[in-house]
């Protein structure tokens, strides 16, 4: 009997044994790293040995959360990239669809390449070349997938801190690039469109596909140049991806049809909250406000000090017009600005704690994913002023879901902003819609934390590819069955041509 118990225990231990996981998250963004920290600490607490390679940001990873090791890289890359962008930003900080080019995004690829060739990364590569069971990598830049080759051809899980790109979905064989229902998130114009506007947006979809195709070609060339002619290309690297985590609720992605190899999490960082107490001055400002407070923050991805004088003046004039007090996150100098008496300016706020406060009436935001999650959780109506990336799509969803309004940052006036704040604070419907949406997001069959751990451990098993669809990572010619369509179109064309010849010649 004892022998059977020993065998049983050994089998159980074998089935539940910890894995050696490498995580590489190259983007030096506070909001991105918040999500990644929540994810890897879950894995470490589960008993897996996790090594994280990431640039330094304000986000500290808890090295006491199980077997968790961090390898720190330089963290200044993102803002330097933003400032060095070759395309002029509108009003100083607005990077709309026109700025989405292969040239601009190639700089991001080169940032990842510099990280991989940095001394800390290379030192770890030499000491642990073939010791990992799984690579977890940020989904934003596919060039980072080369780590799966460098560390011994390991299987891959990709995780996006927010929305996934069209290329991520194509890698998994999910629906993508439908210009109306599942549009490219780099667009800035959504919603009901005239016929002519619809044609222009279709052109934008095709242009974006071309730009990212050019970027993929350049990444392939760089991979061969930096890692040798035998290095795998992007298509081969993408084939190693077993699972994609998308950290938005599916309702924000139009309930896109996806295979089981794509899992929506949504609000993962909310399950890893470390309380940041409000400073005494901020707490007093919030507590003593008799009119209520509007919180204004455009995130950490762009420096608000770079906005042009016209936009800064529009914001300050709007603050002066509002019948509320204002907390404004501004990372630039204020000595050259005339700050209204009702405005408290600071370079950094404990955002979630601010939004929790009972006196906060509205949130003027760039419409980032994490900011949206925090506003919904705290039932704060939103005024979206998108500046870059997927933010225009998020702001568009505010309007569709009835939880806020969206403004065009390139044309923003003081009157527009003041009117929008008055609209979301005076109409009870916005808060009611937020309550309804929060109930929906909380009512899930499994929590984001449970899904993140369960599906990662599924990907670790030998049958980890079982979740993937046959359409995963195929090119457009194969996906559209060109081998069948081309002959059919040729026959149809020849038939019509023959009819025309008979009509006009015979």
From Swiss-Prot:
Family matches, as PROSITE patterns: UDPGT (PS00375)
InterPro entries: Ecdysteroid_UDP-Glc_Trfase (IPR016224), UDP-glycosyltransferase (IPR050271), UDP_glucos_trans (IPR002213), UDP_glycos_trans_CS (IPR035595)
GO molecular function, one term: UDP-glycosyltransferase activity
Group of enzyme by EC: transferase
Record-linked Pfam families: UDPGT (PF00201)
Keyword annotations of the record: Glycosyltransferase, Signal, Transferase
Signal peptide: 1-18
EC nos: 2.4.1.-
Family listed: Belongs to the UDP-glycosyltransferase family.
Reported function: Catalyzes the transfer of glucose from UDP-glucose to ecdysteroids which are insect molting hormones. Expression of egt interferes with normal insect development and block molting.
Protein name according to UniProt: Ecdysteroid UDP-glucosyltransferase
């Amino acid at each position: 009997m004892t022998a059977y118990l020993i065998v049983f225990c050994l089998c159980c231990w074998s089935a539940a044994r910890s894995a050696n996981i490498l995580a590489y998250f190259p983007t030096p963004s506070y909001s991105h790293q918040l999500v990644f920290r929540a994810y890897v600490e879950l894995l470490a607490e589960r008993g897996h040995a996790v090594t994280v390679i990431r640039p330094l940001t304000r986000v500290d990873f808890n090295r006491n959360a199980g077997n968790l090791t961090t390898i720190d890289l330089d963290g200044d890359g993102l803002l330097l990239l933003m400032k060095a962008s070759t395309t002029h930003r509108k009003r100083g900080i607005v990077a709309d669809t026109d700025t989405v080019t292969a040239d601009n995004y190639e700089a991001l690829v080169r940032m990842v390449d510099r990280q991989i060739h940095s001394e800390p990364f290379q030192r770890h590569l030499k000491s642990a070349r073939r010791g990992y069971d799984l690579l977890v990598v940020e989904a934003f830049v596919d060039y980072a997938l080369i780590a799966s080759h460098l560390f011994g051809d390991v299987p891959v899980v990709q995780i996006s801190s927010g929305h996934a790109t069209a290329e991520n979905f194509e890698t998994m064989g999910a629906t993508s690039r439908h210009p109306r229902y599942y549009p490219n998130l780099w667009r800035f114009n959504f919603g009901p469109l005239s016929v002519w506007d619809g044609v222009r947006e279709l052109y934008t979809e095709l242009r974006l596909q071309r730009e990212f195709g050019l970027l993929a070609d350049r990444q392939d060339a760089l991979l061969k140049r930096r890692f040798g002619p035998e290095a795998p290309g992007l298509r081969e690297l993408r084939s190693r991806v077993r699972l994609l985590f998308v950290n938005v609720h599916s309702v924000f992605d139009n309930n896109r049809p996806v295979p089981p190899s794509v899992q929506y999490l949504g609000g993962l960082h909310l399950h890893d909250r470390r309380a940041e107490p409000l400073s005494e001055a901020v707490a007093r400002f919030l507590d003593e406000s008799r009119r209520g407070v509007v919180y204004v923050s455009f995130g950490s991805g762009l420096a608000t000090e770079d906005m042009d004088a016209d936009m800064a003046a529009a914001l300050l004039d709007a603050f002066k017009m509002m019948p509320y007090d204002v907390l404004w996150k501004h990372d630039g100098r204020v000595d050259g600005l005339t700050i209204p008496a009702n405005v408290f300016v600071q370079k950094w706020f404990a955002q979630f704690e601010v939004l929790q406060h009972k006196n906060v009436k509205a949130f003027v935001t760039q419409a980032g994913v994490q900011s949206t999650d925090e506003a919904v959780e705290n039932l704060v109506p939103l005024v979206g002023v998108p500046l870059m990336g997927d933010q225009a799509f998020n702001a568009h969803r505010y309007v569709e879901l009835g939880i806020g309004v969206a403004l065009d940052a390139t044309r923003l006036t003081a009157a527009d902003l003041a009117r929008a704040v008055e609209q979301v604070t005076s109409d009870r419907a916005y808060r009611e819609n937020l309550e309804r949406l929060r109930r929906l997001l909380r009512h899930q069959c499994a929590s984001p934390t449970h899904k993140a751990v369960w599906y990662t451990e599924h990907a670790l098993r030998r049958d980890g590819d079982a979740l993937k669809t046959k359409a995963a990572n195929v090119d457009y010619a194969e996906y559209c069955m060109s081998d069948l369509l081309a002959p059919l179109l040729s026959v149809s064309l020849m038939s019509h041509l023959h009819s025309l010849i008979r009509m006009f010649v015979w």
